[in-house]
Every structure is written in structure tokens, then in C-alpha cells.
């Protein structure tokens, strides 16, 4: 008789109530606990990326999406494909280079769908039998689903999305959109480490930091006999419209003001001088889109604004003259070194 294999005891037990998960390694338990706490102890350090992960392995795999590296190369002759993980490479080899894979066919009448895994076939067949064996475990909820993925998506409505920006913040969003809205409104302010200016978004701070570089890209005005240079395309466009095209179509309607501007953003920023307590510019609400619409990649066309019946003289002059920002290219001229 052969020797008995040693029994592996799962001695790492989840301490959360109503959770019976057990593991044979502590690191697996620690990763599991993050599902209860919402923690992501391994954050991505790339600028502008706010993603976090429950394991170092998942973080290292994510970093490859920033670097573009694909260290796992297919060793099959005449195949030059490479992958970010060994598991993806093995899956590719199995599908593309091994003998024809076994397929599982649905035997229900007029169906015949094929699946690579028996479990996929089994879940698919629940559609034909009208079974919903995956039940929500949340107390007081009796909803059932035909697949684990649909159940998992539903359970998020109970668990929610806890705020990870501040450990003392008690906010829990019912949906990911609620969480993102909360984070943008209350936790998105970032500070420049050089001049202490604050910004609502990391992208704004990233653009601002360019002014502190010893070497920066500058844009020269393309108009003849004009040597003005600017550090942003926005300022160059504003210069062309204001000084070369004499276009200042955006008029401040505040009583006793009447200042005009070449760019709408400049007018919006100017409004704050009349209302110093205004924290931020109000953006028009965006139309609500379903999750399926966003995942499909479809981008709805922007609706054209209706022309107002009354216009200021400055607005009328804009319609009669060409758009200088479209007519002139805005080339990068040189790297300016500050001494």
C-alpha cells in the first residue's frame, strides 16, 4: 500500500462574524481580510494612478501596465507573442499550440453552445432550467442569481465601497460612482510641495509642476514678427485670439464690470473675483449612462447648444471672424532652461 499523504490543516481562520473562510497560509488570510475591511495595502506609486491592491503580486502585475513590459514570452517556434503573466502565457499555449482542446456542448434543444470549461457549461444551463442556485448571504436579502458573477455584483450593494482616502472617514458608497463622487468632492485636494498651492485634481497639479522645472517646453507664437513664448497651449491660444485676432467674445455680465475675455475658461475664472467665497466652478451635469454603455466603449455625441436669442456685440463679432485656434498650428519650439 502507498503512503498516506500528509493532511494540510487550514489553521488560519477568518475572525469576522458569519465568515467561515479558512486558509493554510497567513498571507492568504491577510488578503481575504481586505475584502471585509476594504483596505488596499499595496498602492500603485505611479503619478496619477490611485489604484491599490490586496497583494504584492497583484501590484507587480499592475505595474507592468505602466511600463509596457511583457516578460513571459511564448517559446513556440515562429511565435513572437509575449504576456505580462505566466498564467496568461500558459493559457495562450494551451489554446493556440496544443492539441484541440476539449469542448463542452449544451445538449438542450436548439442551443448547442460550446464552452471550454465544464463549470461554464453548468452555469449556462441554469438559463434553460430557470434555476438560480447562488443566493445572497446578506441578512434579510433573499435574492438569488444564476451565476457567481451576478451574485458578486449584487453583494456589492450591501457591502458598499468604503472610503480609502482617509482612515477616519466613515463614508461608504452604495455604488462605485457614489464613492468616486465623494472622493472628488472631499478628498481630491492636492498640494504642490514646492509652492504649497492646492489643486482639486492630480492632473492639475501635474500640469502646474511644469512651471517649477529648470527646463521646460515653451510654445512660440507662429504669427509674423511676434516673438512671444508661453509655457502652455492655452496661454498661446489666448494670446493669438486677444492680440492678433482682436477676439474677446466672452463678456462678464456682472454689474459694473463688462470685462471681456478670449477664452471661456478665463471668464469662468474671472467670475471668482466677484464671488470670493465660491469654492469651485460649477460644471453642467453630465447625462447618466448605464454600466453597460460605459463598458461597451460607446461615446454619445455631444448635444449642440441652442443659440441664445440675444447676443452681445462681442459675440456677434466672433461669428463673423475665423477661429484663430484652428487656423494656426501651435508647435513646440524648444526647451527653455531657467538660470
Curated annotation (Swiss-Prot):
<feature type="compositionally biased region" description="Polar residues">
    <location>
        <begin position="311"/>
        <end position="323"/>
    </location>
</feature>
<dbReference type="GO" id="GO:0003677">
    <property type="term" value="F:DNA binding"/>
</dbReference>
<keyword id="KW-0690">Ribosome biogenesis</keyword>
<dbReference type="Pfam" id="PF00096">
    <property type="entry name" value="zf-C2H2"/>
</dbReference>
<dbReference type="GO" id="GO:0008270">
    <property type="term" value="F:zinc ion binding"/>
</dbReference>
<keyword id="KW-0804">Transcription</keyword>
<dbReference type="GO" id="GO:0005634">
    <property type="term" value="C:nucleus"/>
</dbReference>
<protein>
    <recommendedName>
        <fullName>Transcription factor IIIA</fullName>
    </recommendedName>
</protein>
<keyword id="KW-0238">DNA-binding</keyword>
<dbReference type="GO" id="GO:0003723">
    <property type="term" value="F:RNA binding"/>
</dbReference>
<dbReference type="InterPro" id="IPR054599">
    <property type="entry name" value="TFIIIA_Zfn-C2H2"/>
</dbReference>
<feature type="zinc finger region" description="C2H2-type 8">
    <location>
        <begin position="219"/>
        <end position="244"/>
    </location>
</feature>
<feature type="zinc finger region" description="C2H2-type 7">
    <location>
        <begin position="190"/>
        <end position="212"/>
    </location>
</feature>
<dbReference type="InterPro" id="IPR013087">
    <property type="entry name" value="Znf_C2H2_type"/>
</dbReference>
<feature type="zinc finger region" description="C2H2-type 9">
    <location>
        <begin position="250"/>
        <end position="274"/>
    </location>
</feature>
<keyword id="KW-0805">Transcription regulation</keyword>
<comment type="function">
    <text>Involved in ribosomal large subunit biogenesis. Interacts with the internal control region (ICR) of approximately 50 bases within the 5S RNA genes, is required for correct transcription of these genes by RNA polymerase III. Also binds the transcribed 5S RNA's.</text>
</comment>
<feature type="zinc finger region" description="C2H2-type 5">
    <location>
        <begin position="134"/>
        <end position="158"/>
    </location>
</feature>
<feature type="compositionally biased region" description="Basic residues">
    <location>
        <begin position="299"/>
        <end position="309"/>
    </location>
</feature>
<keyword id="KW-0479">Metal-binding</keyword>
<feature type="zinc finger region" description="C2H2-type 1">
    <location>
        <begin position="12"/>
        <end position="36"/>
    </location>
</feature>
<dbReference type="GO" id="GO:0042273">
    <property type="term" value="P:ribosomal large subunit biogenesis"/>
</dbReference>
<keyword id="KW-0694">RNA-binding</keyword>
<feature type="zinc finger region" description="C2H2-type 6">
    <location>
        <begin position="161"/>
        <end position="187"/>
    </location>
</feature>
<feature type="zinc finger region" description="C2H2-type 4">
    <location>
        <begin position="104"/>
        <end position="128"/>
    </location>
</feature>
<dbReference type="InterPro" id="IPR051061">
    <property type="entry name" value="Zinc_finger_trans_reg"/>
</dbReference>
<feature type="zinc finger region" description="C2H2-type 3">
    <location>
        <begin position="72"/>
        <end position="97"/>
    </location>
</feature>
<keyword id="KW-0677">Repeat</keyword>
<dbReference type="Pfam" id="PF22110">
    <property type="entry name" value="TFIIIA_zf-C2H2"/>
</dbReference>
<keyword id="KW-0863">Zinc-finger</keyword>
<keyword id="KW-0862">Zinc</keyword>
<feature type="zinc finger region" description="C2H2-type 2">
    <location>
        <begin position="42"/>
        <end position="66"/>
    </location>
</feature>
<keyword id="KW-0539">Nucleus</keyword>
<feature type="region of interest" description="Disordered">
    <location>
        <begin position="271"/>
        <end position="339"/>
    </location>
</feature>
<dbReference type="InterPro" id="IPR036236">
    <property type="entry name" value="Znf_C2H2_sf"/>
</dbReference>
Amino acid at each position: 500500500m502507498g503512503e498516506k499523504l500528509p493532511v494540510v490543516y487550514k489553521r488560519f481562520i477568518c475572525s469576522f462574524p458569519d465568515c467561515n473562510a479558512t486558509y493554510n497560509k497567513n498571507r492568504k488570510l491577510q488578503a481575504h481580510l481586505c475584502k471585509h475591511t476594504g483596505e488596499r495595502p499595496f498602492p500603485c506609486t505611479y503619478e496619477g494612478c490611485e489604484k491599490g491592491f490586496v497583494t504584492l503580486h497583484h501590484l507587480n502585475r499592475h505595474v507592468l501596465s505602466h511600463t509596457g513590459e511583457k516578460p513571459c514570452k511564448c517559446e513556440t517556434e515562429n511565435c513572437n507573442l509575449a504576456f505580462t503573466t505566466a498564467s496568461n502565457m500558459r493559457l495562450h499555449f494551451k489554446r493556440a499550440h496544443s492539441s484541440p482542446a476539449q469542448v463542452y456542448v449544451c445538449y438542450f434543444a436548439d442551443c448547442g453552445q460550446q464552452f471550454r470549461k465544464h463549470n461554464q457549461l453548468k452555469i449556462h444551463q441554469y438559463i434553460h432550467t430557470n434555476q438560480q442556485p447562488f443566493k445572497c448571504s446578506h441578512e434579510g436579502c433573499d435574492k438569488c442569481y444564476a451565476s457567481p458573477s451576478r451574485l458578486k455584483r449584487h453583494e456589492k450593494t450591501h457591502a458598499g465601497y468604503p472610503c480609502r482616502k482617509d482612515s477616519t472617514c466613515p463614508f461608504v458608497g452604495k455604488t462605485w460612482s457614489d464613492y468616486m463622487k465623494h472622493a472628488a468632492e472631499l478628498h481630491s485636494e492636492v498640494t504642490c510641495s514646492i509652492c504649497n498651492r492646492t489643486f482639486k485634481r492630480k492632473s492639475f497639479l501635474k500640469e502646474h509642476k511644469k512651471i517649477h522645472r529648470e527646463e521646460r517646453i515653451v510654445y512660440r507664437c507662429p504669427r509674423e514678427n511676434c516673438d512671444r513664448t508661453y509655457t502652455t497651449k492655452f496661454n498661446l491660444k489666448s494670446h493669438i485670439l486677444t492680440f492678433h485676432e482682436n477676439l474677446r467674445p466672452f463678456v462678464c455680465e456682472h454689474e459694473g464690470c463688462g470685462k471681456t475675455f478670449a477664452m471661456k475658461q478665463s471668464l469662468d475664472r474671472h467670475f471668482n473675483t466677484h464671488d470670493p467665497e465660491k469654492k469651485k466652478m460649477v460644471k453642467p451635469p453630465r447625462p447618466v449612462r448605464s454600466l453597460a454603455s460605459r463598458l461597451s466603449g460607446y461615446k454619445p455625441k455631444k448635444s449642440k447648444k441652442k443659440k441664445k436669442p440675444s447676443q452681445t456685440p462681442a459675440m456677434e463679432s466672433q461669428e463673423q471672424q475665423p477661429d484663430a485656434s484652428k487656423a494656426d498650428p501651435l508647435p513646440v519650439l524648444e526647451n527653455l532652461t531657467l538660470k
